[in-house]
């Protein structure tokens, strides 16, 4: 059992610690700078292979287009949490390389989901560039590319962690999280099929289930849980305590995402929102349904889930009319207070700063 050696020093997401901008940038550069090594690990041996060399060359292109370019919050969280939780005997260079590799496993995991999700949502841009499937010559071949990104996760885990006592824990964690995320995606798809608009399915309970499974497990619990296993924190109680905080944080994050999809600046978010056109069970439409008059509900029925720009505009006008901007601001304040209460209640033997740093990182974000 891990003795929690060295967990008293304060931890926050790299951008939030009281460090100089130079140090913050160095930590990010260290993580981003490890990516070429990940690409080499995954492609170097296969690129010249007489049988599969062409396919591995394609994998290299897929990796370089889809894995970098994001904020890297999930991957950076693994590394920062590992540094905070690890004892003196766990801070050697090789152990830190393992943490960097596991961080990149989560970024590859994210890329796998996003490539597939963009196809299903018929999205146009991602991280300020064309979605991979929209690139000339890619199209639906991107489905197989997403599979390659997923299998890359397990190849990296094997290379860096196979000899480590936590290897099986990480394998099971990634496999379970993939299943949970895919269940969440399925809930999302069957709740709001593109071909049929039925707002009666858009309940708060269903929305919370979609968010928990589709976003919260892999975006918040997975990075922290991975770091916990890597330092030997494997008790069910500690993981349940962390999960109670992190799943709530994931819900908060997704509600922000839904708000930014409609009201955010694409120049900041890097993507053009499509939730209204895609008939998504988003926080905005669920809350709007609780506020509308019968006439306004009919307007929503007639215009939600339609591709025409004028119909999308009518939904946005309705959101303004029923006060969704103010409703979100009120939610953001109350949810942040609730998160702080949960952290106080559940962080027990884990340092509160891990959770407070994550919460502060996403509070009032614009992208």
UniProtKB/Swiss-Prot annotation:
Binds 2 Mg(2+) ions per subunit. GO terms for cellular component: cytoplasm. It is an enzyme of class 2 (transferase). The keyword Lipid metabolism applies. Its cofactor is Mg(2+). Dimethylallyl diphosphate binds at residues 126, 214-215, 254, 271, 280. Keywords: Cholesterol biosynthesis, Cholesterol metabolism, Cytoplasm, Isoprene biosynthesis, Lipid biosynthesis, Lipid metabolism, Magnesium, Metal-binding, Steroid biosynthesis, Steroid metabolism, Sterol biosynthesis, Sterol metabolism, Transferase. Mg(2+) 2 binds at residues 117, 121. It catalyses: isopentenyl diphosphate + dimethylallyl diphosphate = (2E)-geranyl diphosphate + diphosphate; isopentenyl diphosphate + (2E)-geranyl diphosphate = (2E,6E)-farnesyl diphosphate + diphosphate. PANTHER family: FARNESYL PYROPHOSPHATE SYNTHASE (PTHR11525:SF0), FARNESYL-PYROPHOSPHATE SYNTHETASE (PTHR11525). Catalyzes the sequential condensation of isopentenyl pyrophosphate with the allylic pyrophosphates, dimethylallyl pyrophosphate, and then with the resultant geranylpyrophosphate to the ultimate product farnesyl pyrophosphate. Homodimer. This is Farnesyl pyrophosphate synthase. The lineage of its organism: Eukaryota, Metazoa, Chordata, Craniata, Vertebrata.
């Amino acid at each position: 059992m891990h003795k929690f050696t060295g967990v008293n020093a304060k931890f926050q997401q790299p951008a939030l610690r009281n460090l100089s901008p130079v140090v913050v940038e160095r930590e990010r550069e260290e993580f981003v700078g490890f990516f070429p090594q990940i690409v080499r690990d995954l492609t170097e041996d296969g690129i010249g292979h007489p049988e599969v060399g062409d396919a591995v060359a394609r994998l290299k292109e897929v990796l370089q287009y889809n894995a970098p370019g994001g904020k890297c919050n999930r991957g950076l969280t693994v590394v920062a949490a590992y540094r905070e939780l690890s004892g003196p005997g766990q801070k050697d260079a090789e152990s830190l390389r393992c943490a960097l590799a596991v961080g990149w496993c989560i970024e590859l995991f994210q890329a796998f989901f996003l490539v597939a999700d963009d196809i299903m949502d018929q999205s146009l841009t991602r991280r300020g560039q064309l979605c991979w499937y929209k690139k000339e010559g890619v199209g639906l071949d991107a489905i197989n590319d997403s599979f390659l990104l997923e299998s890359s996760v397990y190849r990296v885990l094997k290379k860096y962690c196979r000899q480590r006592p936590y290897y099986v824990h990480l394998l099971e964690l990634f496999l379970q999280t993939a299943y949970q995320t895919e269940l969440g995606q399925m809930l999302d798809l069957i709740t709001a099929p593109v071909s049929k608009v039925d707002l009666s399915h858009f309940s708060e309970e269903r929305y919370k289930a979609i968010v928990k499974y589709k976003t919260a497990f892999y975006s918040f619990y997975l990075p922290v849980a991975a770091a916990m296993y890597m330092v030997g924190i494997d008790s069910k109680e500690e993981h349940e305590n962390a999960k109670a905080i992190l799943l709530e944080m994931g819900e908060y994050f997704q509600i922000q995402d839904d708000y930014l999809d409609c009201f955010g600046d694409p120049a900041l978010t890097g993507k053009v929102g499509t939730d209204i056109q895609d008939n998504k069970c988003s926080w905005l439409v669920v809350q709007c349904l609780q506020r509308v008059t019968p006439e306004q509900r009919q307007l929503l029925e007639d215009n939600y889930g339609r591709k025409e720009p004028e119909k999308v505009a009518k939904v946005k006008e309705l959101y303004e009319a029923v006060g969704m901007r103010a409703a979100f601001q009120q939610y953001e304040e109350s949810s942040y207070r609730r998160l702080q209460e949960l952290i106080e209640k559940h962080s027990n033997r884990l340092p509160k700063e891990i959770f407070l740093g994550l919460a502060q990182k996403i509070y009032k974000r614009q992208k």
